[in-house]
Amino acid sequence: MLTLRNLMTFFLMTIGLSVHAELDFQSGCKDLIKSNQCIEAIEACTIFANQGNPEAQTLLGSLYSGTRYGGFRKNYKKSFTWISMAAEQDYTKAQLAMAEMYKGGEVVPEDARKAKVWYEKVAEKGNLDGINGLARLYRYGTGVRKDYEKAFQYYLQAALAGHTPSQVGLGLSYRDAKGVKKNLVKAYAWLSIAADKIDTQRWKAMEKRYKDEQENLDKSTPQCKHLSKLDQMSERFAIGYARQMILDLKQRMSIKQINKAKKLALEIKKERAFTRSDF
């Protein structure tokens, strides 16, 4: 018969094992990717993936398809297998990766309809990347009939929640009159909200750091460090694109319109409590 003391001991042992396993996963899989030890990362992630860890399965799949240079041979079949296993466990990042794989057509044959199904699964959870994915499908008619109004509504939903790529998409919708009446003031406002996620000084420093990293990249060895920064890379790309589009809009707008747009952007940021990116 189990006593209360025995139950407590068992509980503490279970918690201890769980914490220990998480620490091992962090140091044995994720940290190896961050330190660009790609082959070692594959070996370590495989251990945890075989134990059913969905994050490890997703990372392992990403390593097989996303590691580059150094003579590394990509294995798209293994990549898809591991990521799909994690997705079936309802792991959101894996489900999003499934959508992107079907949309991209590199890891598996392009199938926009399947991409839509996975985006919908993720969007139903309120995931902003999933909502943005649906917006892009409807905006460009990928696997679905073009529906600019639907795209606009999805962009708006995610943009109001602070999703940078969606804020860019919303700004472009206003600029191009896609799903909404053309409004350059609102276009400028939303693009500037996205662009201002990083101040100019930090942006220049980041651009220089990225340029230096690319120039000094050792292509004789496998590279996988970038896989630990995919979310940041997506946001940085959106911010950079927003900055370019603002320069274009400045050529098409009056000083009065620009000032009105800046005021609107400040009002939206204050109302929605938007903050700058912390990377």
Regions found by a protein language model. Give the residues of each.
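Hydrophobic h-region of N-terminal signal peptides that target proteins for export
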Residues: L12-H20
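N-terminal leader/linker segments that initiate helical-solenoid repeat arrays
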Residues: V19-Q51, E55-S62
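Short helix-capping/linker turns of helical repeat alpha-solenoids
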Residues: F25, N50-N53, T67-G70, E88-Y91, ...
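Hydrophobic face of amphipathic alpha-helices that form TPR/SEL1-like repeat modules
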Residues: G28-L32, L59-R68, A97-G104, G133-Y140, ...
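TPR/TPR-like alpha-solenoid repeats
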Residues: F48, L63, A86, M101, ...
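Terminal, low-structured helical/coil segments at or just beyond the last alpha-helical repeat
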Residues: R209, E215-F279
